[in-house]
Amino acid sequence: VFLRDVSQWSQLLLLLALVLVYLYNFRVLDLERVPYMSGIVKNVYALINLGMAGFVMATITVRFVFPAVSAEGAAFWIVRTAPISLGDFLWSKFWTGLVPVLVLSETLTVLANQFLGIDPFLKVASAVAILFMSLALVGLATGLGARYPRFNAENPTQVAGSYGGVMFMILAVLFVLIACVLVGWPSSLYLWHRARGVALSSSQQWTVWLSFATGAALSLVTGWWSMRSGVRALEEMG
């Protein structure tokens, strides 16, 4: 459906153009004018970039992943009679959406952080965070898209603007904000202590790793629960 719909291609090209402009702004950003603050400012920008990448993911998934089930239209009955389970059907939608979203988001994050020249620790933390955020947001979009389908919609834009699409965006924004806090706070704590040449205490180390683990667990649970809820909703349609 995506390949046959010219309007979706045009919207995707527009999105890619905006991403290029976004990256260019990081490329020409001159933080060396404030040498005493450049290190701190770079890391702050990196955390802002993580949040922006999360919001970009939310925008992409609500536009291209959330309508995936609804795009089957009246032909969905064929899926129900096909020799595959509805779970396999929905997970195929998940993996199809995950790959491009993950590649685009990781590229956006890695390149922006490279242009900023941030600390290697924060580079790795951001890349790993994007991986887990992609799993959660694609799972959330696919699951809610199955729970609130609109098989009679004329185009994917109507699906994205439906009740389910609005609910997804609200939940996605809340998730991105929570994820940024769970990644940003411990990362800032670690970098602040390292800049001062002071080692983290044992309790602080546990707090840092607990925060990272909580973020990873929240992402996996969000994606898995959403997919499970979506499969159950499809099964109840019959």
Model features per residue range: what roles?
Residues V1-W77, S85-G238:
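Hydrophobic alpha-helical transmembrane segments of membrane proteins
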